[in-house]
């Protein structure tokens, strides 16, 4: 691919000042050639959250995922370490592991197609009848590994083995999360819900990262969170936003007697496609992964982790609120935006920003757009 065909993309110049900037061109939200560039330049070079260490607590446990169209898996190895590989057999490209999660039936990772088997280092150990194949050397064949990093118990993988470590780039946000929940490494999955959304991943991210839409679109949410206390912070590869919640509201009721810290709702976003959400009144944390699957489709997974893997009454009510109210409200919003992005009457919009970083400030959306621009800078201006 030598160029991006849409003229509005080629002529775009990103303004680093959010007060005067315009959003990314509409075509970047549906142009298929542009999405191919994003797959290579963004998703195959950045960190993807694939779960928590306690999702694969025992030796031989695994989880599978996909970095857009690249199947991957993370495995708890026999030495207790966690490793990750491309989930593709080196023989004929069959997926090695086909379930979302499970446990290996033996010490080896065995392809269900022709029974090629690999050890926990990804080295080929068995290939039936290979002794009859001229010049075949098992020792030369191994699965392609991914880089792995564990942050607060959550497993991040990267297809770029030379990628910079993630933690130093998001440490201030991680430190803030630890002040709320210092023992996240011990948490266990309690609930998960998925939404397959007919919208581009950036569209889903834009909606997640601003609360300008909250008053008209999320009546219960603005009854829960005091919008006067809401603020937005951006830095590097992360952003943080949220506010203080009211104990009595129409979303869900908080326990009495909580401190201000315990009543803070917060969204901690890590580039490019994951956020961690704190719901006050609960010791739970939610991971919010909005993984791109195509130019105009996103697979959104909202997973709730708790200290014991169980839902107490408050956390169960939070799940009910997100699953039945807040989540569907946002899905409808972004799907309608996706339709509007195709209109010949729209090319790009303006950011609504407040120097005080209040609830209606779209600083975090501007931050997301800036990161997209940085990763594909040379493809703008007709490059």
Model-derived regions: residue spans:
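Rieske [2Fe-2S] iron-sulfur-binding domain
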Residues: 55-161, 165-175, 291
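Generic structural signal for secondary-structure transition and capping sites
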Residues: 43-47, 94, 213
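C-terminal catalytic domain of Rieske-type non-heme iron oxygenases
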Residues: 81, 87, 149, 154-383
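Non-catalytic accessory segments flanking enzyme active sites
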Residues: 24-67, 72
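Short, contiguous pre-domain boundary segments
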Residues: 8-25
């Amino acid at each position: 691919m030598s160029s991006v065909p849409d003229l509005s993309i080629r002529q775009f110049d990103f303004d680093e000042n959010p007060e005067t900037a315009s959003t990314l061109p509409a075509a970047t939200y549906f142009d298929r050639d542009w999405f191919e560039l994003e797959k290579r330049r963004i998703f195959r070079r950045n960190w993807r959250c694939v779960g928590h260490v306690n999702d694969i607590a025992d030796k031989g446990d695994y989880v599978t995922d996909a970095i857009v169209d690249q199947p991957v898996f993370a495995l708890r190895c026999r030495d207790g370490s966690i490793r990750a590989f491309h989930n593709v057999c080196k023989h004929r490209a069959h997926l090695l592991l086909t379930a979302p999660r499970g446990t290996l039936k033996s010490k080896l990772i065995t392809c269900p197609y022709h029974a090629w088997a690999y050890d926990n280092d990804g080295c080929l150990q068995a290939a039936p009848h290979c002794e009859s194949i001229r010049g075949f050397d098992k020792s030369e064949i191994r699965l392609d590994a991914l880089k792995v990093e564990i942050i607060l118990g959550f497993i991040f993988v990267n297809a770029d083995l030379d990628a910079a470590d993630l933690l130093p780039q998001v440490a201030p946000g991680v430190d803030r999360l630890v002040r709320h929940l210092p023992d996240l490494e011990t948490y266990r999955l309690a609930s998960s819900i998925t939404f397959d959304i007919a919208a581009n991943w950036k569209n889903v991210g834009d909606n997640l990262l601003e609360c300008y839409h909250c008053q008209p679109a999320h009546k219960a949410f603005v009854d829960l969170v005091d919008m006067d206390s809401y603020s937005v912070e951006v830095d590097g590869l992360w952003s943080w936003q949220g506010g203080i919640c009211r104990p009595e509201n129409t979303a869900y009721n908080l326990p009495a007697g909580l401190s201000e810290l315990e009543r803070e709702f917060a969204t901690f976003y890590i580039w490019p496609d994951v956020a961690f959400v704190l719901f006050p009144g609960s010791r739970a944390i939610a991971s919010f992964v909005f993984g791109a699957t195509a130019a105009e489709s996103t697979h959104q997974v909202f997973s709730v982790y708790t200290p014991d893997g169980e839902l107490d009454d408050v956390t169960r009510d939070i799940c009910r609120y997100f699953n039945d109210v807040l989540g569907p409200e946002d899905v409808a919003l972004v799907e309608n935006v996706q339709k509007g992005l195709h209109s010949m009457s729209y090319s790009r919009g303006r950011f609504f920003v407040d120097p005080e970083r209040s609830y209606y400030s779209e600083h975090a959306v501007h931050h997301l757009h800036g990161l997209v621009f940085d990763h594909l800078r040379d493809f703008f201006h007709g490059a």
